[in-house]
Amino acid sequence: MELDEIISEVKKHITEKRYVHTEGVAFTAAALAMKFSYESGYRENDNMEFVDKARTAGYLHDNAKCLSDEELLAVCAKNNIPVTECEKKSPYLLHGKVGAFYAKTLYGIDDEDILNAITYHTTGRPGMSMLEKIIFTADYIEPGRTRQANLDYIRYLA
């Protein structure tokens, strides 16, 4: 599925407030990808590929955020998605895993880096790829965020 189609589909399935956040994450992710594409192994002529991956992950990162805790757990159970004890206690953390599952099954995303960026955008993990770090950071610093601790300083560092 092309990015324009993904954007259109995502917009149909999330709230307006969530969509504004999603656009902010995609925009911020694209800007960070432009800044860090060279460090990620992309060269001048193909850095737009990395920017497109960042935009795609940004638009899809919260595609399962609208599901209730019960729905997230049910999707995981039905599709054999592993759930940790921590996730059982705080099922909202599963929106990354379920979002990656939906990205693959509903939106046709097969790029492991994009899928991992969606999976770990809330929790992070050791050894994150540059794209994973970008989505994790973009979710925190996107323009619509106003109340995160040390936000101006973190934006400056990014």
Where are these regions (language model features)?
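Divalent metal-dependent catalytic cores for phosphoryl transfer on phosphate-bearing substrates
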Residues: 8-14, 38, 47-158
